[in-house]
């Protein structure tokens, strides 16, 4: 099963997250299937590759709670 979840990047005390499609059995820093966006909580910026996200959602990928909230904020879900 594939999930859309956050992968931590950046440096200490300055986290930036990549939004990735990843196998549910992989750990957080494991190998991802595809990078579909990023989220910077300090600057409150995000970039979403909407066609790639919709592709994975159509294939049955489940977003985590935080990713679901980001997608709702960006109005990917109506």
Curated annotation (Swiss-Prot):
Q: Which GO terms describe its biological process?
A: mitochondrial translation
* One GO term describing the cellular component: mitochondrion
Q: Name one Pfam family in it.
A: Ribosomal_S16
Major place of residence = plastid
Question: Which PROSITE patterns does the annotation name?
Answer: RIBOSOMAL_S16
Q: Which UniProt keywords apply?
A: Chloroplast, Plastid, Ribonucleoprotein, Ribosomal protein
What Gene Ontology molecular function terms does this protein carry? structural constituent of ribosome
Q: Which domain of life is it from?
A: Eukaryota
Q: Where in the cell is it found?
A: Plastid, Chloroplast
Supply the InterPro entries for this chain. Ribosomal_bS16 (IPR000307), Ribosomal_bS16_CS (IPR020592), Ribosomal_bS16_dom_sf (IPR023803)
Q: Which family does it belong to?
A: Belongs to the bacterial ribosomal protein bS16 family.
Q: What is this protein called?
A: Small ribosomal subunit protein bS16c
Protein source organism:
Daucus carota (Wild carrot)
The top of its lineage is:
Eukaryota, Viridiplantae, Streptophyta, Embryophyta, Tracheophyta
Quote the gene name from the UniProt entry.
Answer: rps16
